[in-house]
Amino acid sequence: MADTGTEKLVIIAAGGTGGHMFPARAFADEMRARGWNTALISDSRGLRYAADFPADWKEEIEAASPNFRKPWTVPGAALKINAGIARARRLMKQHRPALVAGFGGYPAFPALAAARRLGVPIIIHEQNAVLGRVNRQFAKHAQLVASGFERLDRLPRGSAHMVIGNPVRAPIIAAGQVPFPPTDGTLNIFITGGSQGSRIIGEIVPLAIANHVAPPLRVRLKVVQQVREEQFESVSNLYRSAGIECELAAFFGDMPERLAAAHLVIARSGAGTVSELATVGRPSILIPLAIAMDDHQAANAEALTAIGAADMILETNATPKLLGELISARLSDGADLTARAAAAKSAARPDAAQKLAEMAERIAEL
């Protein structure tokens, strides 16, 4: 049912967090550079990340994630999902896409279901090292399942699978050209909790640095940290009382520059974060989100820990003392830091968006 016009359309279906939206955006940028029209289907949460998403049109549809532990909520969720599928079908009949690209998250379900029913080719991109629930349901029906990491758990047998990496934004790729900073002066620590912030990182990391890094090293530190607004005052007071230069914000709009300036990054291990660390080439300490579905953040972290580019501390083990000792060990050895940066860079896949776009075009032409 592809459009017979000169410009083909790809509809992008993505969930309601930055982890799904950012790679979808990088893919959309690449497809538009190749002359394609792009459209975005998501729910209200997803569209909050899409103010400047490169799309000819964007559509908010009904979506839900049924909670079978609360069976009384399932009928309402089913009604929302069916309404979303019906709306997605109408849109596809109207706009006649050549392809639907799913980037995971439950808001992607209605568009993928509609595409399957209408016979529109489907490609799926899985950012994490564990295939998500929505992508899992459509993997065997997709012409391609592209993955962000070599490891991809829970992939159904018979699925067409290819490792391409996670598409990252052009400014991140540009930051990857910045050399690792010298380690004989100020040491920059960049601390981020991902697109939704992290209360635990905001509590534990400042205590680790202020109380468990020795003064001779502590005076050389500059800390740049993403914190929630309600934590701003307490974190600021803690750093300043310990004599540590700090810069705090709820969100950093210049993330590529912050990563490039860092000697050490402390972060969650969402797929986007891990891929950006590799692209820029910076050593890290990763604290996976314990409640992540299928423990996928711990699986993601292994892409860097296995090659000596990162350390991983599970939330259950993340005490200020342990973290402070690890920070001290890493920052005290400049040669080791530099080697870890090079190891991270070796895992980079800066051409992921191009590879995914190439496969999308091939599949659309079949």
Swiss-Prot record:
Annotated protein name in UniProt: UDP-N-acetylglucosamine--N-acetylmuramyl-(pentapeptide) pyrophosphoryl-undecaprenol N-acetylglucosamine transferase
Enzyme's top EC category: transferase
Lineage: Bacteria, Pseudomonadati, Pseudomonadota, Alphaproteobacteria, Hyphomonadales
GO cellular component terms given for this protein: plasma membrane
Keyword Cell membrane: yes
Disulfide bond sites: none
Localization, UniProt: Cell inner membrane
Keywords for the protein's UniProt record, in alphabetical order: Cell cycle, Cell division, Cell inner membrane, Cell membrane, Cell shape, Cell wall biogenesis/degradation, Glycosyltransferase, Membrane, Peptidoglycan synthesis, Transferase
Keyword Hydrolase on entry: no
